[in-house]
Amino acid sequence: MAQKISKWKKFKRFLKRNMTPTWAKHFSYQVFAFLTSVAMIVGVADYAVTKSYAERKLTLMDDFTITAHTGAFDTEMNTIDFVKAAIKNKAKVIELDIRQRPDKTVVMSHDLVVTNNDATELEEALKLIKDVPDMKINFDIKETRVLNSLHALLVDYNLIDRSFLTGIEVINVKAVKESNCANMDYYLNYTPSKFRAFSDDYRQKIIKLLEDTGAIGINCNYKFAGGQLSNLLHKKGYKLSVWTVDSQRNAKKMLVIKPDNITTKNPEMIKEVISNWGK
């Protein structure tokens, strides 16, 4: 039985037989022209979409906040340098990733902490934040076993009322409710569907989920947030938080749907977009 020749091999044989210098030059020009045309179309479309967002009237929620993502202001994530930079730049909300060491010391870390020397102790950050009365803290909970120890620290530094939790998945809700953090505000980390948000059944499912969990709203990647979801949540008294918005185009896309919070590694960029809106 003759071996089957793949389409790719057939194409290479065709090129070998027919690729004269003149033909190759003409073919290369066509490919270049095609790619250039595609790039121009994408660029024009991107400009048009961005401009259309900027032409809309901008209204923000009364309690709208910008959270400085850990590592913002050109610092290392979950470090004292980040906390100091956030204070210096007058961030209203800062995000800290929370875990604990094997000895149960609460630390700031995105990744798993395996020794008692890893990561920076959260208490070092709280000592600085407690003296900045208008700063709130977004604690991104990476493991729920840390909740009781975290709560104890917040009580010690009188920061309960200035703190809220994110990173809480549906499977983590039971642990939150059974912890000392049960009465703290928290957003439910969830991946909503922008398309199903038009369905009454799906909309009812979202609201029931929030009612059952006790969350104050949904925290999601900005790619999954849309106007339908935002309107639904606000109509029912819930909030919408989006992450991580780091470009002007995405900032404009998100601002028009009126989230309650935007988490970003570039807070100044978000402020500039708001200040220059419509100009």
Each predicted region: which residue ranges?
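Phosphate-group recognition and catalysis centered on beta-loop-alpha active-site segments
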Residues: 2-279
